Amino acid sequence: MENAGKATSLQSSRDLFHRLMSENSSGGWEKSWEAGATPWDLGKPTPVIAHLVETGSLPNGRALVPGCGTGYDVVAMASPDRHVVGLDISKTAVERSTKKFSTLPNAKYFSFLSEDFFTWEPAEKFDLIFDYTFFCAFEPGVRPLWAQRMEKLLKPGGELITLMFPIDERSGGPPYEVSVSEYEKVLIPLGFEAISIVDNELAVGPRKGMEKLGRWKKSSTFHSTL
């Protein structure tokens, strides 16, 4: 009965989220956070990110998590060797994450900002960017712009980690259907090389079989004309 209750609650959250997005596409994300309609929020760090942190498999330096939401992954990645910026267009999400995590021992190694990913201009570029449930939030026509921003925000030789979801057949969104080829189509022309693309064996619950972990290296010699 408990699992049935959780499933019903999750479906209700999804229904409310889609209604808010359909009513106000530009402000739907903020409305969703205000209403607590965030069905994508796991309530904990993404398991594969926790695994990569524990095994020392992430680059050090400056890291960015766009569309960070509550910020669990931001906090999990932050350390003396890695300062992490969590970016979200929702002011409510950023206020909550800042309040929730500001007293943690590693709080000086992360920060949260409410900014538009497509117009934000940070003072420094990043060594690492992690994308999960962000690429899939945009209609397919926006994906080339997403890739251009990733290229601009990463340092030469920097790494982009894409947790690809949802790899399935669906109409509409968000989340919009994704595939490996959709990432390749927009990243490879901008000088990104796929270092590895594997099934995410640590995917949670209903997302199992619908995710792949992609690790991309930005060329050290590619020069964008954008």
UniProtKB/Swiss-Prot annotation:
GO biological process: methylation
Matching CDD domains: AdoMet_MTases
EC number: 2.1.1.9
Gene Ontology CC annotation, any one: peroxisome
Binding positions for S-adenosyl-L-methionine per the UniProt entry: 29, 33, 40, 67, 88, 116-117, 132
Residues found modified as Phosphoserine: 79
Disrupted gene: phenotype observed: No visible phenotype under normal growth conditions.
Single GO term (MF): thiol S-methyltransferase activity
Keywords: Methyltransferase, Phosphoprotein, S-adenosyl-L-methionine, Transferase
Catalytic reaction(s) noted: a thiol + S-adenosyl-L-methionine = a methyl thioether + S-adenosyl-L-homocysteine + H(+)
Function: S-adenosyl-L-methionine-dependent methyltransferase.
Family: Belongs to the class I-like SAM-binding methyltransferase superfamily. TPMT family.
Protein's recorded name: Probable thiol methyltransferase 2
Record organism: Arabidopsis thaliana
Gene designation per UniProt: HOL3
